[in-house]
């Protein structure tokens, strides 16, 4: 059984192919390049699967930012939250956890109990608690993003609640002579502080991190103050696409089970006749 999952982000499109219960292919393409080079536009957007090197998919599920953008021909669209919850279940093997997904321009916090989503908080209105904020700050500091997100010690205080004003505040701290290390730590701690209000109602022992920001060492260190067990998924950026594959495979298995049941009923009815 082969399933393909696609997560259409604002900056990148992530694709995953799952054969049986193994991921056999994963890759990402810039969003503009994806629509320009791999799609045609008629009544619906049609993805050129051959051009992507994907053949023989029996299930195709899509998710992403914006409902209309994910309505692709031959793909069944699902909402982002469901995709990321399924992805976290698939990657972690857990049934009970709090999921924190920090994407490029939104944040999702979900409570999962016995593999079922039971509570949810979203922030899709402000970039100050998202990955785009970290990218902008790294650009101001002229430092690679993965390097900036390592620092935790002696953070400078950054109080602005707006991503735009935060840049000006950071430049002011640079002018005051703050060290690069403390500036980086300040950026990381300010992200943590902005996430705290969303996390307040989600008390629990185990936190699963997804999204590109999950790779940052500093955020994981700060979150250890609030949770006993911090789990960073192996493929945090591909989590949504993996969740799509997981759901696609689950539906295929249900169809097979249904076919088997119908076949058994058919055989039983024949035996009764004869």
Question: Would you name each region that the model predicts?
Answer:
Residues 3-7, 59-61, 95-101, 208:
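Short glycine-aspartate micro-motif
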Residues 3-40, 117-126:
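Short glycine-rich, Thr/Ser-proximal phosphate-binding strand/loop in the N-terminal lobe
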Residues 31-34, 50-82, 92, 118-120, ...:
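Short beta-strand-loop/turn "lid" adjacent to the catalytic site in phosphate-handling enzymes
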Residues 65-66, 199, 203-226, 237-240:
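Glycine-rich phosphate-binding loops at beta-strand->alpha-helix junctions
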Residues 76-81, 224-243:
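Conserved phosphate-binding/catalytic loops in two-lobed NTP-binding clefts
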Residues 86, 131-135, 139, 233-273:
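Glycine-rich phosphate-binding/hydrolytic loop that grips phosphoryl groups
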Residues 114-154, 159-162, 246-250:
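Glycine-rich phosphate-binding loop plus the immediately following alpha-helix
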Residues 163-203, 237:
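Adenine-nucleotide phosphate-binding core of ATP-dependent small-molecule kinases
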């Amino acid at each position: 059984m082969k399933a393909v999952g696609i997560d259409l982000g604002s900056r990148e499109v992530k694709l995953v192919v799952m054969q049986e219960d193994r991921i056999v292919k994963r890759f990402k393409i810039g969003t503009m390049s994806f629509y320009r080079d791999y799609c045609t536009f008629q009544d619906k957007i049609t993805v050129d699967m051959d051009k992507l090197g994907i053949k023989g998919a029996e299930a195709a599920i899509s998710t992403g930012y914006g409902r209309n953008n994910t309505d692709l021909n031959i793909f069944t669209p699902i909402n982002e939250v469901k995709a990321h919850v399924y992805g976290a279940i698939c990657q972690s093997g857990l049934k009970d956890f709090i999921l924190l997904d920090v994407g490029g321009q939104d944040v999702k916090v979900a409570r999962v109990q016995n593999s079922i989503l039971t509570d949810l908080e979203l922030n899709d209105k402000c970039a100050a608690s998202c990955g785009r904020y970290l990218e902008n700050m790294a650009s101001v500091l002229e430092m690679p993003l993965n390097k900036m997100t390592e620092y935790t010690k002696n953070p400078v205080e950054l109080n602005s609640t707006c991503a735009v004003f935060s840049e000006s505040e950071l430049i002011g701290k640079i002018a005051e002579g703050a060290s690069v290390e403390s500036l980086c730590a300040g950026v990381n701690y300010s992200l943590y502080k902005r996430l705290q209000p969303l996390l307040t109602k989600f008390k629990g022992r185990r936190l699963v991190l997804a999204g590109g920001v999950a790779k940052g060492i500093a955020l994981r260190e700060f979150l250890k103050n609030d949770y006993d067990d911090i789990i960073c998924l192996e493929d945090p950026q591909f989590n949504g696409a993996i969740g799509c594959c997981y759901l696609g495979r689950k539906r295929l298995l249900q169809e097979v089970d249904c076919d088997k049941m119908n076949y058994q009923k058919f055989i039983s009815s024949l035996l009764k006749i004869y």
